[in-house]
Amino acid sequence: DKYGYETHTLDILDKFNPTYLTDIMEWDYKQFPPGYFYIIWASPNCKDYSALNFLSKKIKDLTESNNLILRVLEIIEYYNPKYWYMENPQTGKLKDQEFMVGLPFNDIDYCKYGYDYRKRTRIWNNNENWNGKILCKKDNYCSHRKENTKHINFRWITRGPGVVSRWEQRISIPPELMEEIIVSSV
């Protein structure tokens, strides 16, 4: 990598070409000794914690999703990396789970990192050197939002030219954000 890091990735989906193609619940993370990883980044599935899922009267069982997050926290505790990060939409219910309350975090907007939609995101982390850019709001609009207008809302786009690339962008992390975090971690 540009900064001299060897990158390992883990995902359950082959299309992301991970280093380890496995379910994190089944991954033998103790194959590496504590301290092996300098930085850990986790992007758990956001669908289960989505605020939209909680608008219906039916209560969603979060046991499986919570177990996945607890597994991530277990892995972070085992490796005790210099820096760790876990992201999820700021509007979701992950932040309300008892095991997340009290963990340090920064809220950021993806539009401040080059994307043309806002996607307010909470990043729990232990990096005191990183604060993230100021949120996009009154008196501090990004270049993608002009006064008295709104950002593009990808949630309602279902078909048409460019939708696939937009969806892939929607589930990705802005490269400018990753660059900022890595620079603050060296």
Name these PLM-found stretches.
Residues 1-186:
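Conserved active-site and SAM-binding loop architecture
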